[in-house]
Amino acid sequence: MKNGKVLTATIADIHIGKKSTEALRKELEEGFLTYIEQEKENLDLVVIAGDYFDRVIRFNEPAGILALDLLDRLVVAAEDGGFLLRILQGTKSHENNQLDVFNGVEESKPHLLKIIRKVTKETLNLGGQSRQILYLPEEYPSDPDSYYADYFSDHYDLVYGHGMTDIVGFSFSDWKDEGENISLGTPVHATKTLLELSEGPIIFGHIHNKKEYRGKFYYTGSYSRYAFDSQEPKGWLETELDVDDFSTYTVTFHENKLAPTYGVIMVDNLPLEEGTDLLDVLQTMMDSYDYAKIISADDNNLKLIRQLAEGSNEIKVQTAKKLETERVDSKFNFILENKLSTEETIQKYLDLTEPEADHLSLEVIGMLINPTKGYDYDDVLDQLNRDKVVVD
Protein backbone atom coordinates (compact mmCIF):
# COMPACT_ATOMS: atom_id res chain seq x y z
CA MET A 1 0.00 0.00 0.00
CA LYS A 2 1.00 3.60 -0.59
CA ASN A 3 -0.42 6.53 1.36
CA GLY A 4 -3.18 4.28 2.63
CA LYS A 5 -4.13 3.18 -0.89
CA VAL A 6 -3.86 -0.13 -2.75
CA LEU A 7 -1.17 0.20 -5.43
CA THR A 8 -1.04 -1.87 -8.64
CA ALA A 9 1.06 -1.71 -11.81
CA THR A 10 0.13 -3.12 -15.22
CA ILE A 11 2.42 -3.62 -18.20
CA ALA A 12 1.48 -5.36 -21.45
CA ASP A 13 2.71 -6.17 -24.94
CA ILE A 14 6.41 -6.29 -24.14
CA HIS A 15 6.95 -8.49 -27.22
CA ILE A 16 10.32 -9.93 -26.31
CA GLY A 17 12.03 -11.06 -29.50
CA LYS A 18 10.39 -8.57 -31.85
CA LYS A 19 13.22 -6.09 -32.28
CA SER A 20 16.54 -5.18 -30.66
CA THR A 21 16.86 -7.18 -27.44
CA GLU A 22 19.69 -4.98 -26.21
CA ALA A 23 17.57 -1.85 -26.63
CA LEU A 24 14.52 -3.43 -24.98
CA ARG A 25 16.61 -4.60 -22.04
CA LYS A 26 17.81 -1.04 -21.49
CA GLU A 27 14.25 0.32 -21.80
CA LEU A 28 13.04 -2.15 -19.16
CA GLU A 29 15.94 -1.63 -16.79
CA GLU A 30 15.80 2.17 -16.89
CA GLY A 31 12.01 2.33 -16.97
CA PHE A 32 9.69 -0.35 -15.63
CA LEU A 33 12.21 -2.29 -13.53
CA THR A 34 13.55 0.88 -11.92
CA TYR A 35 9.98 1.77 -10.98
CA ILE A 36 9.38 -1.72 -9.56
CA GLU A 37 12.54 -1.52 -7.44
CA GLN A 38 11.55 1.89 -6.11
CA GLU A 39 7.93 0.94 -5.34
CA LYS A 40 8.26 -2.75 -4.43
CA GLU A 41 7.42 -2.20 -0.77
CA ASN A 42 4.36 -0.14 -1.70
CA LEU A 43 3.03 -2.33 -4.51
CA ASP A 44 0.26 -4.83 -3.84
CA LEU A 45 -0.15 -6.35 -7.31
CA VAL A 46 1.78 -6.34 -10.59
CA VAL A 47 0.08 -7.67 -13.74
CA ILE A 48 1.64 -8.47 -17.12
CA ALA A 49 -1.44 -8.31 -19.35
CA GLY A 50 -0.35 -10.53 -22.22
CA ASP A 51 2.13 -10.75 -25.08
CA TYR A 52 5.22 -11.19 -22.93
CA PHE A 53 6.74 -12.85 -26.01
CA ASP A 54 6.55 -11.88 -29.67
CA ARG A 55 7.68 -15.06 -31.43
CA VAL A 56 9.12 -18.49 -30.85
CA ILE A 57 12.52 -17.94 -29.25
CA ARG A 58 15.44 -20.08 -28.14
CA PHE A 59 16.24 -19.58 -24.49
CA ASN A 60 19.97 -19.41 -25.13
CA GLU A 61 19.59 -16.47 -27.53
CA PRO A 62 19.60 -12.88 -26.22
CA ALA A 63 15.79 -12.61 -26.36
CA GLY A 64 15.39 -15.83 -24.39
CA ILE A 65 17.88 -14.70 -21.77
CA LEU A 66 16.02 -11.38 -21.43
CA ALA A 67 12.72 -13.23 -20.95
CA LEU A 68 14.22 -15.29 -18.12
CA ASP A 69 16.03 -12.33 -16.55
CA LEU A 70 12.93 -10.13 -16.54
CA LEU A 71 10.82 -12.69 -14.72
CA ASP A 72 13.63 -13.38 -12.27
CA ARG A 73 13.96 -9.66 -11.46
CA LEU A 74 10.21 -9.36 -10.91
CA VAL A 75 10.01 -12.45 -8.69
CA VAL A 76 12.93 -11.26 -6.54
CA ALA A 77 11.30 -7.83 -6.21
CA ALA A 78 7.99 -9.49 -5.29
CA GLU A 79 9.71 -11.54 -2.58
CA ASP A 80 11.53 -8.50 -1.22
CA GLY A 81 8.56 -6.16 -1.36
CA GLY A 82 5.69 -8.55 -0.73
CA PHE A 83 3.59 -7.85 -3.83
CA LEU A 84 1.78 -10.43 -6.00
CA LEU A 85 2.68 -11.11 -9.63
CA ARG A 86 0.21 -12.26 -12.31
CA ILE A 87 0.99 -13.01 -15.96
CA LEU A 88 -1.85 -13.32 -18.48
CA GLN A 89 -1.56 -15.35 -21.64
CA GLY A 90 -1.70 -13.11 -24.71
CA THR A 91 -2.16 -13.80 -28.39
CA LYS A 92 -1.48 -17.43 -29.28
CA SER A 93 0.77 -16.60 -32.22
CA HIS A 94 2.97 -14.46 -29.95
CA GLU A 95 3.11 -16.51 -26.76
CA ASN A 96 3.37 -19.89 -28.51
CA ASN A 97 2.92 -21.69 -25.16
CA GLN A 98 6.29 -20.31 -24.05
CA LEU A 99 4.92 -19.13 -20.71
CA ASP A 100 5.21 -22.82 -19.81
CA VAL A 101 8.93 -22.27 -19.33
CA PHE A 102 8.02 -20.46 -16.10
CA ASN A 103 6.01 -23.38 -14.69
CA GLY A 104 8.82 -24.33 -12.33
CA VAL A 105 8.97 -20.83 -10.88
CA GLU A 106 5.18 -20.77 -10.52
CA GLU A 107 5.20 -24.12 -8.70
CA SER A 108 7.98 -23.04 -6.35
CA LYS A 109 6.47 -19.60 -5.64
CA PRO A 110 2.68 -20.19 -5.60
CA HIS A 111 2.27 -17.48 -2.98
CA LEU A 112 3.72 -14.90 -5.39
CA LEU A 113 3.30 -15.92 -9.02
CA LYS A 114 0.40 -17.20 -11.09
CA ILE A 115 0.26 -17.60 -14.85
CA ILE A 116 -3.30 -17.14 -16.12
CA ARG A 117 -4.04 -19.17 -19.26
CA LYS A 118 -7.84 -19.33 -19.10
CA VAL A 119 -10.61 -17.13 -17.72
CA THR A 120 -10.15 -17.11 -13.95
CA LYS A 121 -11.74 -15.67 -10.82
CA GLU A 122 -9.40 -15.05 -7.92
CA THR A 123 -9.89 -13.70 -4.41
CA LEU A 124 -6.92 -11.66 -3.19
CA ASN A 125 -6.18 -9.89 0.05
CA LEU A 126 -5.50 -6.32 -1.04
CA GLY A 127 -5.15 -3.66 1.61
CA GLY A 128 -6.33 -6.07 4.29
CA GLN A 129 -9.61 -6.84 2.52
CA SER A 130 -10.77 -9.69 0.28
CA ARG A 131 -11.13 -8.54 -3.30
CA GLN A 132 -12.55 -10.40 -6.31
CA ILE A 133 -10.42 -10.24 -9.46
CA LEU A 134 -11.42 -11.45 -12.94
CA TYR A 135 -8.72 -12.35 -15.46
CA LEU A 136 -9.56 -12.61 -19.17
CA PRO A 137 -6.50 -13.91 -21.04
CA GLU A 138 -6.86 -14.28 -24.80
CA GLU A 139 -8.77 -17.46 -25.61
CA TYR A 140 -10.67 -18.73 -28.63
CA PRO A 141 -13.90 -20.40 -27.45
CA SER A 142 -16.29 -21.67 -30.12
CA ASP A 143 -19.24 -20.20 -28.19
CA PRO A 144 -18.02 -17.13 -26.25
CA ASP A 145 -21.42 -16.27 -24.79
CA SER A 146 -21.78 -19.68 -23.19
CA TYR A 147 -18.11 -19.91 -22.23
CA TYR A 148 -18.07 -16.62 -20.30
CA ALA A 149 -21.67 -16.71 -19.00
CA ASP A 150 -20.88 -17.86 -15.45
CA TYR A 151 -18.03 -15.39 -15.10
CA PHE A 152 -19.99 -12.45 -16.48
CA SER A 153 -22.85 -13.07 -14.07
CA ASP A 154 -20.66 -12.22 -11.08
CA HIS A 155 -19.26 -8.90 -9.83
CA TYR A 156 -15.61 -7.97 -9.34
CA ASP A 157 -13.36 -5.35 -7.80
CA LEU A 158 -10.83 -5.41 -10.66
CA VAL A 159 -10.70 -6.90 -14.17
CA TYR A 160 -7.55 -7.60 -16.20
CA GLY A 161 -7.52 -8.94 -19.74
CA HIS A 162 -5.85 -9.29 -23.10
CA GLY A 163 -7.70 -9.10 -26.39
CA MET A 164 -10.31 -7.29 -28.43
CA THR A 165 -13.21 -5.19 -27.23
CA ASP A 166 -15.91 -3.40 -29.17
CA ILE A 167 -14.31 0.03 -28.68
CA VAL A 168 -11.50 -1.11 -31.01
CA GLY A 169 -12.70 -4.42 -32.45
CA PHE A 170 -14.34 -2.88 -35.50
CA SER A 171 -11.82 -0.14 -36.19
CA PHE A 172 -9.15 -1.35 -38.60
CA SER A 173 -6.81 1.52 -37.69
CA ASP A 174 -6.72 0.42 -34.04
CA TRP A 175 -5.24 -3.02 -34.61
CA LYS A 176 -3.54 -2.95 -38.01
CA ASP A 177 -0.47 -1.14 -36.66
CA GLU A 178 2.75 -2.89 -35.76
CA GLY A 179 1.83 -6.16 -37.42
CA GLU A 180 -0.96 -7.07 -35.03
CA ASN A 181 -3.51 -9.49 -36.45
CA ILE A 182 -6.89 -10.66 -35.29
CA SER A 183 -6.74 -14.41 -34.70
CA LEU A 184 -9.63 -16.46 -36.01
CA GLY A 185 -12.14 -17.09 -33.25
CA THR A 186 -10.97 -14.22 -31.07
CA PRO A 187 -13.95 -13.00 -29.03
CA VAL A 188 -14.72 -9.28 -29.04
CA HIS A 189 -15.74 -8.38 -25.50
CA ALA A 190 -18.55 -5.87 -25.00
CA THR A 191 -17.15 -2.92 -23.09
CA LYS A 192 -20.57 -2.15 -21.61
CA THR A 193 -20.62 -5.62 -20.04
CA LEU A 194 -17.11 -5.24 -18.65
CA LEU A 195 -17.90 -1.82 -17.17
CA GLU A 196 -20.90 -3.28 -15.36
CA LEU A 197 -18.85 -6.21 -14.04
CA SER A 198 -16.30 -4.23 -12.10
CA GLU A 199 -16.22 -1.82 -9.19
CA GLY A 200 -12.72 -0.66 -10.10
CA PRO A 201 -10.91 -0.16 -13.41
CA ILE A 202 -10.72 -2.70 -16.24
CA ILE A 203 -7.21 -2.88 -17.72
CA PHE A 204 -6.39 -4.72 -20.96
CA GLY A 205 -3.41 -5.45 -23.16
CA HIS A 206 -3.28 -6.16 -26.93
CA ILE A 207 -3.86 -2.78 -28.59
CA HIS A 208 -0.52 -1.01 -28.94
CA ASN A 209 -1.83 2.54 -28.65
CA LYS A 210 -2.97 3.32 -25.12
CA LYS A 211 -6.66 4.10 -24.72
CA GLU A 212 -9.07 5.22 -22.04
CA TYR A 213 -12.84 4.81 -22.17
CA ARG A 214 -15.23 6.50 -19.74
CA GLY A 215 -12.51 6.83 -17.14
CA LYS A 216 -12.78 3.14 -16.29
CA PHE A 217 -11.63 0.98 -19.19
CA TYR A 218 -7.97 1.15 -20.23
CA TYR A 219 -5.62 -0.33 -22.80
CA THR A 220 -2.07 0.02 -21.50
CA GLY A 221 -0.58 0.22 -24.98
CA SER A 222 2.65 -1.59 -25.81
CA TYR A 223 5.67 -1.02 -23.58
CA SER A 224 7.89 -0.07 -26.51
CA ARG A 225 7.34 1.31 -30.00
CA TYR A 226 7.58 -0.89 -33.07
CA ALA A 227 6.08 0.98 -36.03
CA PHE A 228 5.63 4.30 -37.80
CA ASP A 229 1.89 4.46 -37.16
CA SER A 230 2.28 4.20 -33.39
CA GLN A 231 3.42 7.65 -32.32
CA GLU A 232 1.73 7.86 -28.91
CA PRO A 233 3.85 7.66 -25.73
CA LYS A 234 4.65 4.12 -24.57
CA GLY A 235 4.89 2.75 -21.04
CA TRP A 236 2.80 1.20 -18.26
CA LEU A 237 -0.08 2.03 -15.91
CA GLU A 238 -0.09 2.57 -12.16
CA THR A 239 -3.37 2.43 -10.24
CA GLU A 240 -4.01 3.74 -6.73
CA LEU A 241 -7.30 2.53 -5.21
CA ASP A 242 -9.12 3.61 -2.08
CA VAL A 243 -8.68 0.72 0.33
CA ASP A 244 -12.37 0.76 1.27
CA ASP A 245 -13.88 1.71 -2.09
CA PHE A 246 -12.32 0.47 -5.34
CA SER A 247 -14.64 2.69 -7.36
CA THR A 248 -12.45 5.55 -6.14
CA TYR A 249 -9.08 5.33 -7.89
CA THR A 250 -6.42 7.17 -9.83
CA VAL A 251 -4.77 5.74 -12.95
CA THR A 252 -1.37 7.18 -13.85
CA PHE A 253 0.52 6.55 -17.08
CA HIS A 254 4.30 6.14 -16.73
CA GLU A 255 6.19 6.76 -19.94
CA ASN A 256 8.97 4.59 -21.31
CA LYS A 257 11.12 7.52 -22.36
CA LEU A 258 13.62 5.29 -24.13
CA ALA A 259 11.07 3.85 -26.58
CA PRO A 260 12.53 4.23 -30.09
CA THR A 261 11.23 7.08 -32.23
CA TYR A 262 9.77 6.56 -35.70
CA GLY A 263 9.60 9.55 -38.03
CA VAL A 264 7.90 10.00 -41.41
CA ILE A 265 9.53 12.52 -43.76
CA MET A 266 7.51 13.72 -46.76
CA VAL A 267 10.31 14.92 -49.03
CA ASP A 268 8.07 16.58 -51.61
CA ASN A 269 6.59 18.84 -48.91
CA LEU A 270 9.95 20.13 -47.66
CA PRO A 271 10.51 23.89 -48.29
CA LEU A 272 13.90 23.41 -49.94
CA GLU A 273 15.71 26.42 -51.38
CA GLU A 274 17.44 26.14 -54.74
CA GLY A 275 20.87 24.60 -54.41
CA THR A 276 20.10 22.90 -51.09
CA ASP A 277 21.64 19.45 -50.73
CA LEU A 278 18.68 17.12 -50.14
CA LEU A 279 20.80 14.40 -48.55
CA ASP A 280 22.26 16.84 -46.01
CA VAL A 281 18.76 17.98 -45.06
CA LEU A 282 17.52 14.41 -44.72
CA GLN A 283 20.53 13.35 -42.66
CA THR A 284 19.91 16.22 -40.24
CA MET A 285 16.23 15.34 -39.96
CA MET A 286 16.94 11.65 -39.44
CA ASP A 287 19.22 12.43 -36.53
CA SER A 288 16.00 13.16 -34.60
CA TYR A 289 14.67 9.62 -35.09
CA ASP A 290 15.77 6.07 -34.43
CA TYR A 291 13.86 4.91 -37.51
CA ALA A 292 12.78 6.99 -40.49
CA LYS A 293 10.40 6.43 -43.37
CA ILE A 294 11.18 8.76 -46.28
CA ILE A 295 8.45 9.28 -48.86
CA SER A 296 8.64 10.94 -52.27
CA ALA A 297 6.93 10.79 -55.67
CA ASP A 298 9.96 12.19 -57.50
CA ASP A 299 12.07 9.51 -59.18
CA ASN A 300 15.28 11.56 -58.93
CA ASN A 301 14.74 12.12 -55.22
CA LEU A 302 14.03 8.44 -54.72
CA LYS A 303 17.34 7.49 -56.33
CA LEU A 304 19.22 9.77 -53.93
CA ILE A 305 17.25 8.55 -50.93
CA ARG A 306 17.90 4.90 -51.78
CA GLN A 307 21.63 5.65 -51.82
CA LEU A 308 21.29 7.08 -48.32
CA ALA A 309 19.25 4.09 -47.14
CA GLU A 310 21.45 1.40 -48.68
CA GLY A 311 22.52 -1.12 -46.06
CA SER A 312 20.50 0.54 -43.30
CA ASN A 313 17.83 -1.20 -41.25
CA GLU A 314 16.73 2.13 -39.78
CA ILE A 315 15.62 3.79 -43.01
CA LYS A 316 12.60 2.81 -45.09
CA VAL A 317 12.00 4.34 -48.52
CA GLN A 318 8.50 4.55 -49.93
CA THR A 319 7.02 6.15 -53.03
CA ALA A 320 4.09 8.51 -52.71
CA LYS A 321 2.50 6.61 -55.60
CA LYS A 322 2.40 3.50 -53.45
CA LEU A 323 0.65 5.43 -50.70
CA GLU A 324 -2.00 6.55 -53.16
CA THR A 325 -2.44 2.97 -54.33
CA GLU A 326 -2.93 1.83 -50.75
CA ARG A 327 -5.61 4.48 -50.20
CA VAL A 328 -7.45 3.42 -53.34
CA ASP A 329 -7.16 -0.28 -52.60
CA SER A 330 -8.61 0.15 -49.13
CA LYS A 331 -11.94 1.05 -50.75
CA PHE A 332 -12.18 -2.50 -51.98
CA ASN A 333 -11.84 -4.24 -48.62
CA PHE A 334 -15.49 -5.28 -48.95
CA ILE A 335 -14.42 -7.79 -51.63
CA LEU A 336 -12.06 -9.56 -49.23
CA GLU A 337 -14.53 -9.37 -46.35
CA ASN A 338 -16.94 -11.49 -48.43
CA LYS A 339 -20.02 -10.25 -46.56
CA LEU A 340 -22.02 -9.30 -49.68
CA SER A 341 -23.63 -11.55 -52.26
CA THR A 342 -21.83 -11.93 -55.58
CA GLU A 343 -24.35 -9.61 -57.24
CA GLU A 344 -23.99 -6.98 -54.50
CA THR A 345 -20.19 -7.18 -54.66
CA ILE A 346 -20.18 -6.64 -58.43
CA GLN A 347 -22.69 -3.80 -58.13
CA LYS A 348 -20.64 -2.00 -55.49
CA TYR A 349 -17.41 -2.49 -57.47
CA LEU A 350 -18.97 -1.06 -60.62
CA ASP A 351 -20.38 1.91 -58.72
CA LEU A 352 -16.92 2.68 -57.31
CA THR A 353 -14.95 2.20 -60.52
CA GLU A 354 -17.49 3.62 -63.00
CA PRO A 355 -19.27 6.38 -61.05
CA GLU A 356 -20.40 8.12 -64.27
CA ALA A 357 -22.02 5.00 -65.71
CA ASP A 358 -25.63 4.01 -65.16
CA HIS A 359 -26.30 2.05 -61.99
CA LEU A 360 -27.00 -1.63 -62.73
CA SER A 361 -29.65 -3.35 -60.66
CA LEU A 362 -29.01 -6.62 -58.88
CA GLU A 363 -31.50 -8.27 -61.26
CA VAL A 364 -29.45 -7.36 -64.33
CA ILE A 365 -26.19 -8.41 -62.74
CA GLY A 366 -27.77 -11.70 -61.72
CA MET A 367 -28.89 -12.34 -65.29
CA LEU A 368 -25.43 -11.57 -66.66
CA ILE A 369 -23.58 -13.87 -64.29
CA ASN A 370 -26.10 -16.72 -64.34
CA PRO A 371 -26.59 -17.66 -68.02
CA THR A 372 -27.36 -21.24 -67.04
CA LYS A 373 -30.70 -20.05 -65.60
CA GLY A 374 -32.01 -19.55 -69.13
CA TYR A 375 -31.72 -15.77 -69.44
CA ASP A 376 -31.08 -14.55 -73.00
CA TYR A 377 -30.02 -11.18 -74.40
CA ASP A 378 -33.60 -9.96 -74.77
CA ASP A 379 -34.31 -10.72 -71.10
CA VAL A 380 -31.36 -8.57 -70.11
CA LEU A 381 -32.44 -5.72 -72.42
CA ASP A 382 -35.97 -5.82 -71.02
CA GLN A 383 -34.65 -5.55 -67.48
CA LEU A 384 -32.33 -2.69 -68.48
CA ASN A 385 -35.29 -0.84 -69.96
CA ARG A 386 -37.28 -1.34 -66.77
CA ASP A 387 -34.32 0.09 -64.84
CA LYS A 388 -34.21 3.01 -67.32
CA VAL A 389 -30.62 2.24 -68.28
CA VAL A 390 -29.70 3.60 -71.70
CA VAL A 391 -28.14 0.97 -73.98
CA ASP A 392 -26.22 2.15 -77.06
What are these regions (language model features)?
Residues 2, 241-392:
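Accessory, non-catalytic peripheral segments of nucleic-acid enzymes
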Residues 76-85, 197-200:
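A short helix->loop->beta-strand "cap" motif at the edges of active sites that frequently abuts
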Residues 86-188:
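Conserved catalytic scaffold of divalent metal-dependent phosphoesterases
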